[in-house]
Amino acid sequence: MKLRKTKFFSQLKHQVLTANQKPFLFYKLTMIGFVGFIILLQVFILRNALNGEMDNTMVANSGFINIYVIRNKGVGFSLLQNQTGLVYFLQGLLSVIALVFLVFMVKYSYIFWITTLAFGSLGNFFDRLTSANDSVLDYFIFQNGSSVFNFADCCITFGFIGLFFCFLIQMFKEFKHSKNQ
């Protein structure tokens, strides 16, 4: 049993070191620093700018996307509204999974999207953690829409969409490569 644990940790260490060699590690750290900083900065700048607005208040009506401020204690579409512990767990879990994937990722094309996803989730997690009533401030709404969302939600959504397209492109390239052989 001990031998298997040692072998597992040895392989894990090898994978981490392989996935994080100097030029690639520099790229990852740059993405984490730059993208993470920009996302968290935007989350808190927008939160502070809109925090003084009353709940359910229309702040700006620009046409396509309007600003309508509400507090949301749940996750997407206000699901799990009164289950604060589960909401924290799910957002924390998403952040941890994304960061673990980031540590082991060896493809440049995925790094930006995983970082965007991870820090969007962390933005919501920290927004909720620092609010007085365990809620996030949602403020964007499409014209004639009913769903209200925030910048961190956009980062999570675009992170998943970007990862999906990267995965499709990779599958297409591998299929094309295997077909040519």
Swiss-Prot record:
Its EC number is 3.4.23.36. It catalyses: Release of signal peptides from bacterial membrane prolipoproteins. Hydrolyzes -Xaa-Yaa-Zaa-|-(S,diacylglyceryl)Cys-, in which Xaa is hydrophobic (preferably Leu), and Yaa (Ala or Ser) and Zaa (Gly or Ala) have small, neutral side chains. Its main location: membrane. The chain crosses the membrane at residues 25-45, 86-106, 107-127, 149-169. Pathway: Protein modification; lipoprotein biosynthesis (signal peptide cleavage). GO terms for cellular component: plasma membrane. It is found in: Cell membrane. The active site is at D138, D153. One of its GO terms (molecular function) is aspartic-type endopeptidase activity. It is a multi-pass membrane protein. GO terms for biological process: proteolysis. Keywords: Aspartyl protease, Cell membrane, Hydrolase, Membrane, Protease, Transmembrane, Transmembrane helix. The keyword Protease applies. This protein specifically catalyzes the removal of signal peptides from prolipoproteins. Belongs to the peptidase A8 family. HAMAP family: LspA. This is Lipoprotein signal peptidase. It comes from Mycoplasma genitalium (strain ATCC 33530 / DSM 19775 / NCTC 10195 / G37). The gene is lspA.
